[in-house]
Amino acid sequence: MRGAAGRVWVLNLDAESELSATHSYAPTQHLRTIVQRERQRLIGTLVGPNDVVLDEERIERGDPLPERIRGWPGLAWCPTPRALALLRRVGAVPVLTPGLELLRTINARPFAARLRSEHAPGSFEKHCATDMEQALALLARPAESGWLVRREFGAAGRGRRRLHSGRPGADELVWLQASLRQGPLIIEPWVAIEREYTRSAWVRRDGSVLISEPCAQTTTEHGAWVDTERIHADAITRADDEALEAMTERVARALSVAGYHGPFGIDAYRHRLPQGGATVLNPLSEINARFTMDWATAMARDPRTGVALDELHRLSAEPVIEETT
C-alpha cells in the first residue's frame, strides 16, 4: 500500500542502547548529539527526497509538522518501542515490525556467536561469559594480543573494550561488573584485521532473501563505521565471496525462523593468525537486524549512486499490517 508520496523515518541510531535498557530508556544529550550528526549521512541514500525524518526534540517542543504525513508508511532504523511510538504520535503507520523481545534476541551478540560457532574454520573461537567467574577464567587464558570483550549490545564502537590477558585492573573490573549487569559478555582474542567486509540483505515474509553484492567496510580502531564501498569481483576471492554469501543466507534463515523479516546486515573480516602468519576469514563478526549505515550503498541497483530508494520501495511496498501480540 503506497498511496502516499513519501515515508516517515525515525533514525534511532541509538537503538542498541534502548535494547540493552532493562527499564525505561531515554538517550543522554551526548548520545542525541551523536545520533543527530550521524543520521545526516543517511539523507539522500536511505532517506528519499520526499521522505520526512522525525526529530524527537522538535516534536517535544511542539514544533508544527506537515499535515500531509498523516497516514504515510513509517519506517525506523530499528523499530524499537520509542521509535514506533514516535511514528504513531505523528499519525504515520508503522510498517510491519517484530516485537521488542525478538529484536533483543536477534540483535544480541550471543545470537550471532551461536550461528558462527560451527562455520568459522580456521578462525578463533568466541566465548560467552554470563558471570564474573567465567569472565575472569577466560581472560586469564594466554592471548598474544589480549582479548576483545563485547557487551550483549553495542554499535558504532560502543560497548566493547580491549583487555590484556591476565587479571583485569580495578577500573576494568568495574567495567566488567557493569557490563554483566546488562547481560552476557562475548570474549574473543584481539586480532589484526586485514580487510573488513559487509553484506546487506532483506529477508522477506516467506523466508526468501535478497542479498547485496560484497562490500568493503572501513571502521576506526574502536570499531565505529567510517565508510563502505561496493567491490569488484576480482577484489575478493571466490572462496571468501561464497563463504559470505552462505553465511548471509544462514543468518536470513535464522532470522526468519525466529519471526523476523526486513533489513539486516552482517559484518565480517579477514584477520591475521597469531605469530604474524597467514590470514583467515572470520565470516561473521556481527549481525545487525535493522538498517545499517551501508545498507543503501550495498543494496542500490546502481552502485555509482549509493541510493537504494527504488529497491526499498519495492521491498517495503507490501500491505501495512501491524502485528498484534
Model feature map: region roles:
Residues L148, L284-S285:
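Short hydrophobic beta-strand that contains or immediately precedes a catalytic carboxylate
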Residues R238-E242, A278-L281, A289-T325:
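C-terminal active-site "lid" helix and adjoining low-complexity regulatory extension at the edge
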Residues G223-T279, E318, E323-T324:
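A long amphipathic alpha-helix within ATP-dependent nucleotide-binding catalytic cores
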Residues R32-G48, V53-A137, R141, G154-A155:
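Conserved N-proximal alpha/beta basic substrate-recognition cap immediately N-terminal to
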Residues E125-C128, G146-E172, R195-T198, E221-I236:
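Glycine-rich phosphate-binding loop of ATP-grasp-fold ATP-dependent ligases
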Residues G122, G146-V149, H164-A192, A252-L255:
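Conserved ATP-binding module of the ATP-grasp superfamily
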Residues D171-H222, Y269-L284:
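Phosphate-binding site of ATP-dependent enzymes
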